[in-house]
Amino acid sequence: MPGSVFALMDAAKGRARAAGLGVIDLSIGSSDQPPPEAALEALREATRDPATYRYPLFSDTAPLREAAAAYLAGRFGVRVDVEREVLPLIGAQEGLAHLLLAVTDPGDTLLLPDPCYPPYLGAVAVAGLRVVTLPLLPERGFLPDLDAVPADVRPRVLLLNYPNNPTSAVADAAFFREAAAWCRARGTLLVHDHPYAELTFGAYRAPSALEAGLEGVVELHSLSKTHHMGGFRVGYAAGDAGALAALARVKGAVDFHPYLGIQKAAAVTLGLPDELGRAGARVFEARRDALVPALRDLGWEVALPQASMYAWARVPGLTDSVAFAVRAAETTGVAVSPGRAFGERGEGFVRFALVQPPEVLVEAARRLGTVSRDLPADLARQLA
């Protein structure tokens, strides 16, 4: 379903451009901000150093592992062994897919939130896992109810993501302590995808699942969102030594770690002053402050996000978010992500990526106020 939905959205954006509409694309969560200048300078220097051109071995990743360990200690108070409990990744998405291959067998059960980030579904499918969904409901703050999992379900992995994509919901340290305890009692690996760790607003600061202990917990960190380095494809996993050893064995068969120049840029970035990251977060906070009131003026239901780069809006009376999103793109040029693309529980919602300046977001909301929610017959046939 997600792949077909995004293909429909791409086609709708193409038709809008062909019709001469000024497209405002809020459907993809790719930061429009530049990476830190220090990261760019480190990369430029590395490209002029012939020593960086060879295959990077595990021993070559030590500076990045040490930088990640220092960040985890300084930001979360989490201490990791740089040899056993932190591992560089070619992006967190790569890390998750290979981690599931490393720690599960085909047919194992994975607990997956609904709605969720669509690439999770691909990683689960590649690993051949059985999925049991965890509804994320507004009345629970989009947090899963682990006590509602049937007693006969024995999951190998619980996959979480807070600050959350797509809902922008947040979790506190107590939630992660409870989730980790629940997992340890069942022999379940808790995997936490944490790409929005520093994209937080106001006084809120996102905790780490590793604060609940490293045993049975793996956390995936990325520089794509918080440091605007999506194209660099770099991140790291930290946590349970056994799970990371299994992941390292899988990665040893398929890659040689990120290019050394990119590792150097990432290591420099992780050591930058906290205020630089906070300044970047304030850019997205200002966008949130512009968009949310504009959507509420339309009568849409949207909570004020405390973190992430998204706004998750319920459109009153909406029963087909895909049809709505396609119609919106075709008739107004505003592209949003239909909630159904993130799972059944996403129906009735649309997701906005805060990747345009405040005035453009306000204009997008104005245009969306003109969109009909009627489902075109030809689109209904496509989705049948």
Give names to the regions the model predicted:
Residues 2-91, 98, 269-272, 285, ...:
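N-terminal small-domain helix-loop-helix segment of the aminotransferase-like
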Residues 16-19, 127, 185-186, 298, ...:
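Helix C-cap/helix->beta junction micro-motif
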Residues 52-181, 198-199, 204-213, 377-383:
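Conserved core of the PLP fold type I
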Residues 78, 327-337, 342-384:
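PLP-dependent enzyme catalytic core of the Aspartate aminotransferase-like
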Residues 112, 133, 159, 191-192, ...:
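Hydrophobic residues in well-ordered beta-strands that form the structural core
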Residues 210, 214-285, 372-373:
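Conserved core segment of the aminotransferase class I/II
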Residues 267, 284-292, 302-314, 346:
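Conserved glycine-rich beta-strand-loop-beta hairpin in the small C-terminal domain of fold type I
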